Regions:
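C-terminal amphipathic alpha-helical segment
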Residues: 286-289, 307-309
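Acidic (Asp/Glu) and glycine-rich low-complexity loops/linkers
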Residues: 1-160, 166-179, 183-222, 228-241, ...
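Short, catalytically relevant binding-site loops at active-site mouths
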Residues: 284, 294, 304
């Protein structure tokens, strides 16, 4: 009796929940014709322009599924241009010296269950000035683009779930960029940079009309995407990825440089560093025309370590099954250790130490004339 009683209770509860769901969906269908009708959720879009007369020094934009772009104003007046829809409302105001742009999805929760997501929208902000204090942009799936002309004296925060983020602005405070699956790109004159992505690519550096990218410190991290740093000058650089590669080209880092990946390769081309730590599990490490004024610590499990006209004051190199080969620019005192591989290094009594350890790989180093 007890068992059949509880079975009846569970079945009855399930029927009640199913009935409530049907009522909710039925209400949505009755109140709004056909829920999946294209003209209802994916219909016409009306371009809206919001004119701003008040002055402001800070900008905050929070939208749902729209791209965000800052563009110069042609008439020295601020305008916020939105692509409104019947189900997304934009509010634009100036509150406590801050331009606030906010989007709200006006649909009921049950109207969103089977309806297409609100996407393909855009927000463009035409700014009359080129210098502001701070900027915050948050969007779910839209792209974020910040023009090279702008300067922010304080912090800039840019976040998107699946959209790409790019900025070429000059930023005096901290730049924080975050996306789950979107790519991140930053250039310009920067102070400190943090870039985080799960599966997107991260790129730092590049030339602008005002010059090369500069930054005090940069912390770049992605789970499965690539990390690239090009044409940049920094004081400290940290690049970390799970399964992607790390590439640095035409980069100057006056302090410490750290590059770490699990299964990707690490390569430096025309780079100068104060010190270098490079670690990878199954990828190779390549240093070409690269000079490290201090120490190089390079380690890989199954990949090889290769040099081409590279140099450092001291080197510690370690690989399990890969080889260590290449050319250095100045003499070194070599200390080698290999289990089954061959060894061919110059015999020298001057220079910094170069310790090389491998289990089954060969060791072959030459000194450039």
């Amino acid at each position: 009796m007890k068992k059949s009683f509880w079975i009846s209770i569970i079945v009855a509860g399930g029927l009640i929940l199913a009935g409530l769901a049907c009522i909710a969906v039925g209400h949505g269908l009755g109140g709004h014709r056909i829920l999946m009708e294209d003209s209802l959720y994916d219909g016409h879009t009306v371009d809206g322009t919001h004119h701003i007369s008040q002055d402001f020094d800070r900008i905050r934009i929070n939208v749902i599924a729209a791209g965000v772009e800052l563009i110069p104003s042609e008439d020295d007046k601020c305008r916020v241009m939105t692509k409104d829809s019947e189900y997304v409302e934009y509010t634009v105001s100036v509150v406590e010296d801050t331009l606030v742009v906010r989007a709200t999805d006006t649909r009921k929760w049950y109207e969103r269950l089977f309806a297409p997501s609100v996407s393909g929208r855009s927000v463009k902000v035409a700014l009359p000035r080129e210098e502001y204090k701070s900027l915050i942009v948050e969007t779910v799936s839209g792209q974020v683009n910040i023009n090279v002309r702008y300067t922010f004296s304080e912090d800039v925060t840019l976040t998107s779930t699946s959209g790409n983020i790019g900025t070429a602005a000059s930023i005096g405070g901290h730049l924080d960029m975050r996306s789950t699956s979107g790519d991140l790109y930053a250039m310009g004159f920067l102070n400190t940079v943090t870039a985080r992505s799960t599966s997107g690519k991260i790129t730092l550096g590049g030339k602008t009309v005002y010059g090369d990218c500069t930054a005090a410190t940069a912390d770049l991290e992605t789970t499965s995407g690539e990390i690239r740093v090009k044409t940049a000058t920094l004081e400290r650089l940290s690049a970390q990825t799970g399964s992607g590669g790390i590439r640095m080209e035409s980069v100057t880092v006056t302090g410490d440089t750290s590059a770490e990946t699990t299964s990707g390769g690490i390569s430096l081309l025309y780079a100068t560093c104060g010190s270098l730590t490079a670690e990878t599990g199954s990828g190779g490490i390549d240093l070409t025309d690269t000079t490290v004024t201090g120490h190089i610590q390079a380690e890989t499990t199954s990949g090889s370590i290769r040099f081409a006209r590279a140099d450092a004051e001291t080197l510690d190199l370690k690989t399990t099954s890969g080889s260590v080969k290449g050319s250095l620019r100045t003499p070194k005192i070599f200390y080698t250790d290999t289990t089954s591989g061959s060894v061919d290094v110059p015999k020298s009594t001057e220079g910094g130490h170069c310790e090389i350890e491998t289990t089954s790989g060969s060791i072959r180093i030459t000194i450039e004339d």
